[in-house]
Structures are given as C-alpha cells and as structure tokens.
C-alpha cells in the first residue's frame, strides 16, 4: 500500500536547501504561481513553499494557499520525479477559488513530470 503522508523528510527546511533550488531551477509557471524544481540525490521529492505577505496580506489566505499546495504534493508525491520543488506564490493567487487553484497546480505538476522525463532521455 502506498503511503500518502507529508512527513518532515519531504519538506525543504533550511535556507541552503531553498538556495540550491533557486540557483538553477526548471520552471513551470502561470501568472499566479511558479513551481521551481531541481534534481536531488534522494529517492523521493521534497517541497518548499514561499507565500509572501506582499501578495496575500491575511494569514488565513496564506495558510489556505500553503494547505492546498501541500495537499496537491502529498497526493502526487509518488508520481513526481526525485526533485526538490519550491512553489512561489505570485500576485493574484488569492483571487483563485480552490478548484481552479488545484487544477492549475495539477497542470504545473504534469509539466514538471514531462520536463523530468525529457531531461532523463537526454
């Protein structure tokens, strides 16, 4: 049975881990959200989130975005390549409703899966 947990080991925790992804990322983006990715040496993907107060003033709005991102990652973690992912929220993300937001995330995850397969074949 596949475990769909989101434990501590599946998260990017330190500034150095985030910096590693920001140095040479693969990007998939929409006007509201960007997912950056970079290959890691582990056997599983990891996730980091950046949601600035500049784009979402209220804490409950930032928490909603982070919760939806974590849930999306948790459900797809076994399909994703062994990359470190950083989700960057941009202006206008707060205006999206939950179904639209999850659809956008799903599309971006699929794009990263395709990019990873393409880079493996090269």
Swiss-Prot record:
Q: Which Pfam families match?
A: Ribonuclease_P
Q: InterPro entries under this entry? A: Ribosomal_Su5_D2-typ_SF, Ribsml_uS5_D2-typ_fold_subgr, RNase_P
Coiled-coil spans are none
Subunit info here reads: Consists of a catalytic RNA component (M1 or rnpB) and a protein subunit.
- Which purpose does this protein serve, as stated in its record? RNaseP catalyzes the removal of the 5'-leader sequence from pre-tRNA to produce the mature 5'-terminus. It can also cleave other RNA substrates such as 4.5S RNA. The protein component plays an auxiliary but essential role in vivo by binding to the 5'-leader sequence and broadening the substrate specificity of the ribozyme.
Q: Which NCBIfam families match?
A: rnpA (TIGR00188)
Q: Any idea what this protein is called?
A: Ribonuclease P protein component
- This chain's source organism reads Mannheimia succiniciproducens (strain KCTC 0769BP / MBEL55E)
Its lineage reads: Bacteria, Pseudomonadati, Pseudomonadota, Gammaproteobacteria, Pasteurellales
């Amino acid at each position: 049975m596949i475990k769909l947990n989101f434990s501590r080991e599946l998260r990017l925790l330190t500034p150095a881990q985030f910096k590693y992804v920001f140095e040479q990322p693969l990007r998939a983006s929409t006007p509201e959200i960007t997912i950056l990715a970079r290959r890691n040496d582990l056997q599983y993907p990891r996730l980091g989130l950046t949601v600035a107060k500049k784009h979402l003033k209220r804490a409950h709005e930032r928490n909603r975005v982070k919760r939806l991102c974590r849930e999306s990652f948790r459900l797809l973690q076994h399909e994703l390549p062994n990359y470190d992912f950083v989700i960057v929220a941009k202006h206008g993300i707060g205006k999206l409703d939950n179904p639209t937001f999850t659809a956008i995330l799903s599309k971006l995850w699929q794009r990263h899966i395709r990019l990873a397969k393409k880079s493996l074949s090269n």
